[in-house]
A protein has these predicted regions:
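Flexible, low-complexity linker and terminal segments
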Residues: 1-8, 17, 130-348, 353-354, ...
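Thiamine diphosphate
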Residues: 1-133, 161, 224-225, 248, 379-516, 526-527, ...
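Short acidic, glycine/serine/threonine-rich loops at helix termini
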Residues: 34-37, 60, 81-85, 107-114, ...
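Short helix-loop-beta junction
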Residues: 37-43, 242-251, 478-484
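A glycine-rich helix N-cap at a beta->alpha junction
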Residues: 43-50, 91-102, 182-187, 436-449, ...
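Conserved thiamine diphosphate
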Residues: 104-153, 159, 191-194, 410-412, ...
Length: 588
């Protein structure tokens, strides 16, 4: 059956058709939907793990047991999972093991623009890179075959545009491979130094065999053109190149980007008057081509940063190569439309429970070390509350170092903020360090009862699993106390006075402390909202105090405040800032 599918949904379909049995992932845009779609297949057990390292180790355990398994994450998640990645390259697999990493060129929702192809090279594992939804489905099945044939984990590299665009997929039935029997093999699976030394030559031999496979695999293909011009490309860049040049140039479309096909590249280059490599981010393919002695152009004319587009490629290549300008012709430009559309910067939603807390921190002129999640938006004006955001869990570790460096000077005004899901991901070890090494630090856990920014996924503190069924629930207060924190306070962020008192008290304390700011995300379906507030125009003096919250439901028209009833959820936080009492509920 032919279906129009999102790239991530197609990859999940490929897992199903390829006989996957176990999926363990951590949500992260743009990878999240793969696991959310996989859970819809009854034949696949799916779960959200506390972090990417746990997810990969879980998937490896399932592979060890003889089942085909999968774990998914965004690009920065592979940093977290790097430890098991490098060693399971040595151990190899039993059942097929796929690791999906979704890169984010242009950083639509990420803190960096790293290129995950380097991980495949460094870990010496194969990497496949689909260019549309159909390939996402087919490459998943191919990855399992490669994994089991070559005794290796396989990385599938997605990117934002492939993950979140749609194309036609020809769906097929499910393959049900038999469970491979588990056999104890200490030399293969127990990575003591002696065994690891023996396994390293296997990794090198496997890489050589994979390189030969890449030369003949249908994952890589040549599309011949009418001109003696060759373009080597992959993923999204392939789609742009095809749209610009049609059949005028020859294209080597790479679906397997590690190891790269040496012989195929050399053969493709023969007879070409001009050879280009078109790839987003780092010059991985270009560097390899140059190591083969090929004269190629790439990052000398194309940017190292951000996403490509057909317009960008047409402009850059036409300017650099007059011959290409003749072939490109006129490309309809979407830039004018982009320039005319007003910007819509991300903001915390109306009724967001984090807003009241950040207002309190801003009012108290706190130095705030932030973390990864919806609450990162607290850095935006008018709250402008966050001073640092690095990576998952870094706020808790960083405040320890910050306060150890500055002592009492910072202890009385510095806090760390971290979400409930992020705390479970990688904040606990930082808190253990605070308790163990006794820094007088205040950590605020923003507990909104969900993993919010990636689309409302469950986590170990919610009490529900990926299917919404009841599951084990970790109590944050008990956990913090068990880790050695004696001062644990819970506040409602809608109660500004309580927040203010808690912040002042804990900053004044002479020992480590935790404040749990607890209220469910305003967008959760079970959260009941109050009627929208209204503005008494006679009482409103236009002081703009309500605007200090940065709530999207509040605006100024003329000199008076206005509330958008379609957005307001009646949280009442703004009314607590309005001294004239102009903001209130509708009175009958």
């Amino acid at each position: 059956m032919r279906q129009l599918m999102l790239g991530n949904k197609a990859l999940a379909r490929g897992l199903y058709e390829g006989g996957c049995s176990i999926v363990s992932s951590y949500p992260g845009t743009p990878s999240t939907e793969v696991t959310e779609e996989a859970v819809k297949f009854e034949e696949i057990y799916c779960e959200w793990a506390p972090n990417e390292k746990v997810a990969l180790e879980t998937a490896f355990g399932a592979s060890l047991a003889g089942k085909r398994s999968f774990c998914g994450m965004k690009h920065v998640g592979l940093n977290v999972a790097a430890d098991p990645l490098f060693t399971c390259s040595y151990t190899g697999v039993n059942g097929g093991l796929i690791i999906c990493v979704a890169d984010d060129p242009a950083m639509h929702s990420s803190q960096n623009e790293q290129d995950s192809r380097h991980y495949a090279i460094a870990a010496k594992v194969p990497m496949l890179e689909p260019a549309d939804s159909a390939e996402a489905c087919e490459f998943a099945k191919a990855a399992y075959e490669i994994s089991e044939e070559f005794d290796t984990p396989v990385i599938i590299r997605m990117c934002t545009r492939i993950a979140h665009s749609q194309s036609i997929v020809d769906t097929k039935g499910r393959v049900c491979p038999p469970t491979k029997p588990y056999e104890k093999n200490v030399r293969k699976y127990v990575m003591t130094p002696a065994n690891a030394i023996a396994r390293h030559p296997f990794v090198e031999e496997r890489t050589a065999r994979l390189a030969e496979f890449a030369n003949t695999s249908s994952l890589n293909r040549v599309e011949k053109g009418s001109e003696p011009i060759g373009i080597i490309t992959s993923s999204t860049s392939y789609q742009y190149v095809k749209e610009i040049f049609c059949d005028h140039v020859s294209i080597l479309k790479l679906g397997m980007v590690n190891p790269l096909p040496e012989k195929l590249l050399l053969d493709f280059a023969k007879g070409k008057e001009l050879l280009l490599v078109v790839e987003e981010l780092d010059p991985v393919i270009e560097t390899y081509c140059k190591s083969l002695g090929l004269s190629v152009h790439g990052k000398d004319v194309l940017p190292m940063t951000g996403e490509f587009s057909q317009n960008l490629l047409a402009e850059k290549l036409s300017k650099a190569f007059p011959k290409l300008a003749e072939l490109i012709g006129t490309i309809p430009s979407g830039r004018k439309l982009d320039e005319e559309i007003p910007g819509r910067p991300p903001v915390m939603c109306a009724g967001c429970p984090h807003r009241g807390l950040f207002y309190t921190l801003s009012k108290n002129k706190c130095t705030v070390l932030g973390d990864i999640g919806c609450y990162t938006l607290g850095a935006a004006a008018p709250l402008s509350s966050i001073d640092m955001t690095l990576c998952m869990g870094a706020s808790v570790s960083a405040i320890h170092g910050f306060n150890k460096a500055l002592g009492e000077e910072s202890e009385k005004r510095t806090v760390a903020v971290i979400g409930d899901s992020t705390f479970m991901h990688s904040g606990m070890t930082g808190l253990a360090n605070i308790a163990y090494n006794q820094s007088n630090s205040t950590v605020i856990i923003l507990d909104n009862s969900i993993t919010g920014m990636t689309g409302h996924q469950q986590n170990p503190t919610t009490g529900y699993n990926i299917k919404g069924d009841p599951a084990g629930k970790i109590d944050l207060e008990s956990l913090c106390r068990a880790m050695g924190i004696r001062r644990v306070t819970v506040v409602d962020p809608y109660d500004l006075d309580a927040c203010d008192r808690a912040v002042k008290e804990e900053l004044a304390a002479t020992e480590p402390s935790v404040i749990i700011s607890r209220r469910p995300c305003a967008l959760l379906k079970y959260v009941k909202h109050k009627p929208a507030l209204v503005v008494d125009q006679e009482k409103c003096v236009g002081c703009r105090a309500c605007m200090k919250l940065g709530c999207p439901a509040i605006s100024i028209r003329g000199k008076k405040a206005m509330i958008d009833a379609t957005q307001c959820v009646g949280c009442g936080v703004c009314s607590k800032l309005c001294r004239p009492g102009a903001l209130g509920e509708v009175t009958k």
